[in-house]
Structures are given as C-alpha cells and as structure tokens.
Amino acid sequence: MDQDAFFFERDPEAEGEAPRKQESLSDVIGLLDVVLSYKPTEIGEDRSWLHGIIDNPKENKPSCKADDNNKDRAISTPTQDHRSGEESGISRRTSESKTETHARILDQQGIHRASRRGTSPNPLPENMGNERNTRIDEDSPNERRHQRSVLTDEDRKMAEDSNKREEDQVEGFPEEIRRSTPLSDDGESRTNNNGRSMETSSTHSTRITDVIINPSPELEDAVLQRNKRRPTIIRRNQTRSERTQNSELHKSTSENSSNLEDHNTKTSPKGPPPKNEESAATPKNNHNHRKTKYTMNNANNNTKSPPTPEHDTTANEEETSNTSVDEMAKLLVSLGVMKSQHEFELSRSASHVFAKRMLKSANYKEMTFNLCGMLISVEKSLENKVEENRTLLKQIQEEINSSRDLHKRFSEYQKEQNSLMMANLSTLHIITDRGGKTGDPSDTTRSPSVFTKGKDNKVKKTRFDPSMEALGGQEFKPDLIREDELRDDIKNPVLEENNNDLQASNASRLIPSTEKHTLHSLKLVIENSPLSRVEKKAYIKSLYKCRTNQEVKNVMELFEEDIDSLTN
C-alpha cells in the first residue's frame, strides 16, 4: 500500500494554527496496542467504495457553527449506491461521524490506560491478506460509506509530486520486515507478491489518496522504520536536491495532518449517535484520529528528538545486511566462483537466492529457515551432478566396449591382409629368385648389351592332349597326381628339402635363415665323424657349394665311403 496514505495533508497557511505537542513514548505504545487489538481484516469482500471520489467543500470549518439543517444535509458523490434501504441513514451518519471524534478520543485514552495494565479490549491477531482482496472493515449489507474531507488543491499537489513520493517510498524500506515472510528478491512485479510490498499495486490516483487500510504489525514497523534515520548506503546516487525535496514533502504532510486534528477536535458533539451507525463509523474515525496522532508524533520525533539507540540498531542492521551481501559477492568473484558481482545479484540459482536471503534475514528464525533451504538446494544440485556423471560414465563405458569390438575386428582384418601380402611376396620371390635366368646362376658371363640379328630357334608349341597323361613325362600330368608321385619317389628323408616346399606355406619361405635345415644337419653329421679336421672342412665347404640335390647326394656318398674305409 502507499506509505503516504498514513498522512493527511493540510494547507501551509494554517501552519501556525496547530500548536505542536510533544508526544511521549507511552502514547506511541498505546497507539500500537490499539492497532494490534483491532479487528482482523477480511478477504474477498467488496472494497470498490474505496475508489469513490471524496468530495467535501472547504466550508467544513465554519459548518460547526451553522444550523442543524446544514448538518443534516448529505454531500452526494458521483458514484451512486443502488441499494434502496440506505438513503435515510446516510445524511445522519455523515454529520454524526464528525461529532464522534471527541468521544472516541476519550475512549482511546481509556484503552491506553487498559493497555498499560496489560489488558486490551479486543485482543485479536492481525492478518494481512492479499492486497487485492483486503478491505478496510466489515460492513453490514445495508450500510453505506461516509465521506471524508479532502482539499482539491492538495490533490493537485499530490498528483504533481507522485514521482517524488515513489522515490521516497523505495528509499527507506529494507527488503524484509521483522515478523514477516521474507520478500523475494527476483525482481517480480509488486502487484503479485501477496500483499507483502509497501506500496499499492496501481499507479497514484488523486481519488484514493485518503484510503486507509487497517495497518498490520508489519506495516506499523515499516512506517516506524521509514521515519527513522535512514542509512546512507541504500541510495548512494541520490542527489542533494532530491533529499531536500523529500524532507520538505515530509514536513508539509506532517503539518497538514496536525491541522486536520485541530479541525476534528473543534467539532462539538450534539448527541449520542445510534448504535448501528456508530458501529459503521467507529473504525474509520479511529483511522482519522490514529493517523493524525501518529503523524504528529513522527513529525515531532523527526524535528526535536535526537535519534534513539533503536534507530541506530535498525539502520546498522540494514547496512550490515547490504554490506554482507556485497562482501559475499566480492569474495565469490575473488575466489573465481563468479565472474562478476552483478552476476551474483541476478543469479536465479536456488542456493544463491537462499544465501542472499540468509544474509538479509532479520532474526534467527528466518536465518535458520533460509539456511535449511540453501542446504537442501545444494544437496539437490549435487545429486543432479552425480546423476549426470553416472550417465556420462555409462556412455563412456559403452563407447569403450564398441571401440574394443572395432579393434578386435580390425586386428583380424589386419592378419588376413598380412597373410595375403606374404603370399604375394613369396610368389614374387619365386619369380625373381634367380633373376629370371633359366640357366645355371653360377655362370657369370656377361651378356652383350647389343644383340646382332640371328636365327632364333622357335620352340614348337604342342597342343595338350589327354593321351599325354599316360606318357612317362612329368610335364603332362595333372598337379595333384604329380605331387603324389613326387612324394612316392622320395627315398632319402635327409634330401627332402625341396619336396617339403610343396606342403609348406608361402610365408614360411620368407623366414630368414643363414642355412637350410638339411645342410645344418649334414654339417653336424660331418663334424661328429672320425675324419680329420681338414677333411671335415673340405666336405662342409663342398656342401655349401652344392646347387642341386644330386650334387649333395654325390658329396654324401663320398663321405660315407671315407668313413667305411676308416672303420674297415
């Protein structure tokens, strides 16, 4: 709600008329007891009558000396009430509401005395509901609104200074108020925060400047803090001209409210009003008296009394709450957790929001509540990170398994390729083993580089005939039969080196070796023989010079003959 709704304005001409009274602290305590003992506001009922135009001419002051006919005359408003049963009681109630203020002041003095003794006339808890559904008081169905006096030129001044008042509203309020739920610091609109903001949801209108909502303890504390000394850390960029304008605005509002109190006390009661009308007019006139007395007290406190230690403690609390948030943001930036201080202030992370609320909390109850929220949010975020890491580990494990399968298949494919390459190399080795020469490779005669023309002996090509297989020649027999016959022809197992090549794989021919297995075994036989050392060397040297199997066979026959001659 609008904070300036607690203050009535008055003309600056009438400044000297109202003597300023020095209110004691007991009056303030009694006022707060009255507020706390008042009826709770109710939700969901009609409060459209609050927006009606309040139209009372300036001739109110001499009206107390006029005739009874002028007092009984009702002032009509543009918004007509269509309920038919109320017309007779309107004029009486509007005039008698003025005469009740003196009697109500006496009642409130009795309430103050009762509150000092520890009793209250109606100790009901206050309940501040949603600001869109809150209404002032509980009206019976056949009662109508009473009129309040307002000055048209003051309305104009209020409309002109609306921007200044909005800046003044934002200036002095902390983010959270004692005994209230913490305000959300996410920058949402003030129209949707369940009645916790300190200003009205609509823009300023001159029609509803005097609308008063039953103040709850939260609003009372808020207005008390508003009138205390304000910390300089809240508005650093406020210029000196704005401060002077705001102070002048507060002075004018407090002086106008004291003038209105004088005007209300001058009206003399003509007679006791009926009970049903008194029940309707009592809460609203209570607002008038409470509001004027309250503003007088605040004005006197602002002008005459020095700041109390309570003012200093609340200001220090606000300063420490703001400085603690700034220090936390700077520490996070210096540690590298946040990039900038602005990022921490605008962060929407749950743990960050709870941390900011905990630093700004007013008491230990809110601090523990926000601490629990921060711990739960941190635990939830850690659980989410653990789940993300688990999913990542599962994905990595699946990728590793797939890569293992790929590696296994690739190694098998590589083995196949290696075997094919070795087979191709072995065929190339067979072709180029003797340099393409068909004759004896030991013949080292140089062939001439220039060939003269001569007769070439043309070899006749014989066509293959199946009858050739019956012939004795090996060249016309099929490969399978030829292999079997060659195996059968082998008699000496020591000399089967070339025949074994038919069964061996192609890759085994490329295995590097200094000497063949057959030559090695024959060399061992010669070395273990009882021949002399010179003869052994001669036989081994002749073995290495052999090119065909027949030569090896001849050398070994000679060796056997020598051994037989020695043994015999």
UniProtKB/Swiss-Prot annotation:
CDD domains: MEV_P-protein-C_like. Essential cofactor of the RNA polymerase L that plays a central role in the transcription and replication by forming the polymerase complex with RNA polymerase L and recruiting L to the genomic N-RNA template for RNA synthesis. Also plays a central role in the encapsidation of nascent RNA chains by forming the encapsidation complex with the nucleocapsid protein N (N-P complex). Acts as a chaperone for newly synthesized free N protein, so-called N0, allowing encapsidation of nascent RNA chains during replication. Disulfide bonds: none annotated. Residues 190-208, 294-305, 441-450 have a biased composition (Polar residues). Homotetramer. Interacts (via multimerization domain) with polymerase L; this interaction forms the polymerase complex. Interacts (via N-terminus) with N0; this interaction allows P to chaperon N0 before encapsidation and form the N-P complex. Interacts (via C-terminus) with N-RNA template; this interaction positions the polymerase on the template. This is Phosphoprotein. Keywords: Coiled coil, Phosphoprotein, Viral RNA replication.
